[in-house]
Amino acid sequence: MFRLLRFSPSRYYPRSMAPVRWSTHPYHVTAPRMWGTRMPLQLQASLRPNNAVEKGISGDVKVAGAMVKPAASGGESAKSKTPTVSELKILKDLFRYIWPRGDRKVKTRVLIALGLLLGSKLLNVQVPFFFKSTVDSMNIEWGDVGTALPIAVTLTVLSYGAARFGAVLFVELRNAVFSNVAQSAITKVSLQTFQHLMKLDLGWHLSRQTGGLTRAMDRGCKGISYVLSAMVFHIIPITFEISMVCGILTYQFGASFAAITFSTMLLYSIFTFRTTAWRTRFRRDANKADNKAASVALDSLINFEAVKYFNNEKYLADKYHTSLMKYRDSQIKVSQSLAFLNTGQNLIFTTALTAMMYMACNGVMQGSLTVGDLVLINQLVFQLSVPLNFLGSVYRDLKQSLIDMESLFKLQKNQVTIKNSPNAQNLPIHKPLDIRFENVTFGYDPERRILNNVSFTIPAGMKTAIVGPSGSGKSTILKLVFRFYEPEQGRILVGGTDIRDLDLLSLRKAIGVVPQDTPLFNDTIWENVKFGNISSSDDEILRAIEKAQLTKLLQNLPKGASTVVGERGLMISGGEKQRLAIARVLLKDAPLMFFDEATSALDTHTEQALLHTIQQNFSSNSKTSVYVAHRLRTIADADKIIVLEQGSVREEGTHSSLLASQGSLYRGLWDIQENLTLPERPEQSTGSQHA
């Protein structure tokens, strides 16, 4: 059986793309999109740790010349399990933000906006009446004009202008008043979504493509803005204005005009809604292709160095081009269907307007209507063209925004699996803490166990090392203690208490971690150190920098601690990054310390200097330290060594006792590392030798 692995260059090479433009999501690039629009590319630093298997650009894997389709990725399976959110539920959830309980300020703004909306529509309907009066006043024999008529005409014209300006003024005031409500709603939803994503477990994040995730958040936030404005300023006003015009036509000119108007509105709405529903699938396909293109670009750009190392620029360009072509095809269908919708809408409205104008002209000829009435009917019906055009575009964009918001609200509906128990207690951090694994079984995949019925104890206040071959479960122990995952069986105790009964925040606050690849923010050295404890004073940060022996580095840098480390810390060396990580955990001052392959990527000289720094700062009995290591020389002085093999504890003891044990796995690993020799070169054949 072949073991299928999906290669991810980001596991081996740093991501080197600097941020281009900050938005609600970091690393936001805008690239040309087909047909004159723009396609934003979300470049988000991946949430996956470097030792996690990531999904590559292509989901297919070649094994022995055959193309093998891997099982559904975590993202796909997770997607199928994600709860669906109905449009009605989305609108109901959104209503809570524009009419929040107990917030009178927001409610007052909404009521004022609705009042201004009503006033603008009433003034807007008055405009055709003032125009009719002006036309009728002018339709006289000018030789009989007295002095009073010009004044009446002047007042009518002034009223016409005042009504038009008043309607526009009320609309702008309404927008200004409601903008605060809309932006506050967007801010609240964005923040709540971000906070919810931070609460979701690590397994959920590993199963998602970050580029598509940030794109969904970006579109969803924009969708909120549009839905709020559409519902408050378009749907309600259009309905109100159509009802008012139909009532006026019925009262002024009879049921025949109102019947045509009502039939037109009904046919127009049915055609718009059905055509838009048909177009929705094209929009969904476009969004899917858009996410795919963004993910391909994201994976390619953040692994820029790997692309160059293997000369695969053309391969990735072809991948990106394929995604863009799918997006282009979807957008063409969107544009073509939009042209069909606009043509149908205009045909329906123009036919109705022509019929009503013909009827009005007959009325003028028969003497039942005046020329002013003809103008009034034309103005009233034609005035509906604006809200009707809005109805079509608003419904189209409203459906699209609801689709975009669906993805955003789906994120909020994902359940948090790692959470506090009802009676969670705080973990005491004023004393050394021990860690006990009792019959723990765990696997990232149900078909592949990483730990199998493991039991061991990490003594309090002592240095314990965990060693073993690759894949034996060493780093998994940290993830379980940190409660990134829950064990399938057994339990883990810290300080004598099951970690499931401990407050999650207090547990994680008690654990300090120095990882193999230190995650750094694209910020200054000072801010990166401060991240270990953001409430620390300047003096405490300086002491942590001194203890981690970063002072010399800062002295050699032109800007000192204000130097920006670059994306993922590329502006400083590996040893300096690890010292920065040590400064962080010194600032955190946690009673439990994990060093997860903290020196494996360093040269011998840097490794020894870093081990000396660790020894100076973490050798006291006040802290429990756990070292996960491949290089056995770095943990030879440990008080206890736990050797793992194939997910089980093979042996335990000190360095000397394990070396003294004949046939021990630890001794075999030690001998291999200490007696490593170069393989002999094969002898050349006699025929190839030269005298």
From Swiss-Prot:
Residues 23-109, 179-227, 274-339, 396-691 are mitochondrial matrix. One of its GO terms (molecular function) is ATPase-coupled transmembrane transporter activity. One of its GO terms (biological process) is intracellular iron ion homeostasis. Its EC number is 7.-.-.-. It comes from the Eukaryota. CDD domains: ABC_6TM_ATM1_ABCB7 (cd18582). Residues 110-400 form the ABC transmembrane type-1 domain. ATP binds at residues 444, 468-479. The keyword Cytoplasm does not apply. Residues 435-671 form the ABC transporter domain. It is a multi-pass membrane protein. It is found in: Mitochondrion inner membrane. Residues 1-22 form a transit peptide. PROSITE patterns: ABC_TM1F, ABC_TRANSPORTER_1, ABC_TRANSPORTER_2. The chain crosses the membrane at residues 110-131, 155-178, 228-251, 253-273, 340-358, 374-395. Pfam families: ABC_membrane (PF00664), ABC_tran (PF00005). This is Iron-sulfur clusters transporter ATM1, mitochondrial. It comes from Eremothecium gossypii (strain ATCC 10895 / CBS 109.51 / FGSC 9923 / NRRL Y-1056) (Yeast). The gene is ATM1.
